[in-house]
């Protein structure tokens, strides 16, 4: 039981750790952007480091299981590189430079809501409002949005927890806030689209390490082309062994290569809604780290927003947990227990009969449609004393 609980907790632990990595990336990149580093150059180097970090593992571990590359899959990977490494990262860095890590991560909490909408439209997530679990997921997502809005538009009085000498930080101009909000909302839309497309692509190309490598490599090429066009000066791509290089390496290795790998694994197991449900934790972590590391003050609106955010995140995760339990229960119900005496060699096929079929058998009035359909069966092969069972779906 303990081992089983440990296995079930691994996805949650992995996603929480990932949010700490994203929070650190916010603080480090904010520092280098304020010092004058171009976000186009930062994105290009970030994806170059990500490619170099993840490519060896993909080449060694997936050389025998790598799926065949087709043109439709290649175009999906190209689009993934455009949505994630290029559009999302550049727009997010613009918003981050204009405001603060807390504000940027707060606006990005709209990602789970957009992901649920897109996943529902593409039939990757079922939303049945008559069921409590689905209603809780939707309401939890809306609550996270409300918490983000509180953190963005309501500051309230300054809170000095330890009676320190921290003072309320000066706010950027309103025009910068509005401009940053637009860029961050567009980045969130691109990021949510990336998650949904990644989940769909993994069903066609299951080698997630190889796919992450190709996404990072494509993103590097696209980002370099964009940097050359926007900077108008090739020397802008030159960086030394300084904070700029450290920020690029950290963002590339932690927030791109490792993040894409972990997200890909969780996407295959839990789906895009589960992955994005943890995004609101970033603003909580960033707020705490900004207070202790950067010396930025905390306001009452931020504290209230964090509490509301946590309630929303818990509601969404509870709904997903109930969904997962329901899927496991339905899977177990599809397995038919077969009891036979040892020593009977041969092949036994037993169809699964539901309640409606039982009534038809009893009355002898089974319809022709039921006769033409292929029932789910369990094939049991008896060879000496060994029993092997194979479940075949409809």
UniProtKB/Swiss-Prot annotation:
Presence of keyword Membrane: yes
GO cellular component: plasma membrane
One GO MF term attached to the UniProt entry: L-glutamine transmembrane transporter activity
Localization per Swiss-Prot or TrEMBL: Membrane
Keyword Ion transport among UniProt keywords: no
Main location: membrane
SUPFAM superfamilies documented for this protein: Multidrug resistance efflux transporter EmrE
Key words of the record: Membrane, Repeat, Transmembrane, Transmembrane helix
Entry's transmembrane regions: 13-33, 40-60, 67-87, 102-122, 142-162, 180-200, 209-229, 245-265, 273-293, 298-318
EamA domain ranges (all copies): 22-147, 189-317
Pfam families in the cross-refs: EamA
GO biological process, one term: seed development
Membrane topology: Multi-pass membrane protein
PANTHER family linked: WAT1-RELATED PROTEIN (PTHR31218)
UniProt similarity note: Belongs to the drug/metabolite transporter (DMT) superfamily. Plant drug/metabolite exporter (P-DME) (TC 2.A.7.4) family.
Protein name from the UniProt record: WAT1-related protein At2g40900
Native source species: Arabidopsis thaliana (Mouse-ear cress)
Upper taxonomic lineage: Eukaryota, Viridiplantae, Streptophyta, Embryophyta, Tracheophyta
């Amino acid at each position: 039981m303990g081992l089983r609980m440990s296995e079930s907790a691994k996805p949650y632990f992995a996603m929480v750790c990932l949010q700490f990595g994203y929070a650190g990336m916010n603080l480090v990149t904010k520092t280098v952007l304020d010092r004058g580093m171009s976000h186009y150059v930062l994105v290009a180097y970030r994806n170059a480091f990500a490619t170099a970090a993840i490519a060896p593992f993909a080449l060694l571990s997936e050389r025998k299981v790598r799926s065949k590359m087709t043109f439709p899959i290649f175009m999906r990977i190209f689009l993934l590189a455009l949505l994630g490494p290029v559009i999302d990262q550049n727009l997010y860095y613009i918003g981050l430079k204009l405001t603060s890590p807390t504000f940027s991560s707060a606006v990005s909490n709209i990602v789970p809501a957009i992901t649920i909408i897109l996943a529902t439209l593409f039939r990757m997530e079922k939303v049945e409002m008559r069921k409590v679990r689905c209603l809780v997921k939707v309401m939890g997502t809306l609550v996270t949005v409300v918490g983000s809005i509180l953190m963005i538009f309501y500051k309230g009085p300054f809170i000095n927890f330890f009676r320190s000498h921290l003072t309320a930080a000066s706010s950027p101009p309103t025009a910068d806030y509005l401009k940053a909000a637009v860029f961050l909302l567009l980045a969130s839309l691109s990021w949510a689209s990336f998650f949904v497309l990644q989940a769909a692509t993994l069903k066609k190309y299951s080698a997630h390490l190889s796919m992450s490598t190709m996404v990072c490599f494509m993103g590097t090429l696209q980002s370099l082309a964009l940097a050359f066009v926007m900077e108008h000066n090739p020397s802008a791509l030159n960086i030394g062994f300084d904070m700029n290089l450290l920020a690029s390496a950290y963002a590339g290795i932690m927030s791109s290569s490792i993040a894409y790998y972990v997200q890909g694994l969780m996407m295959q197991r839990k789906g895009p809604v589960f992955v994005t449900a943890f995004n609101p934790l970033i603003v909580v972590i960033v707020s705490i780290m900004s207070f202790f590391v950067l010396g930025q003050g905390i306001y009452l609106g931020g504290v209230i927003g964090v509490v509301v955010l946590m309630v929303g995140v818990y509601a969404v995760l509870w709904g997903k947990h109930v969904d997962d339990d329901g899927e496991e229960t339905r899977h177990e119900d599809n397995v038919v227990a077969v009891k036979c005496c040892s020593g009977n060699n041969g092949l036994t096929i037993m169809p699964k009969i539901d309640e409606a079929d039982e009534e038809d058998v009893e009355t002898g009035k089974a319809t022709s449609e039921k006769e033409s359909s292929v029932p789910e069966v369990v094939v049991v092969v008896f060879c000496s004393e060994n029993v092997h069972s194979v479940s075949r779906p409809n």
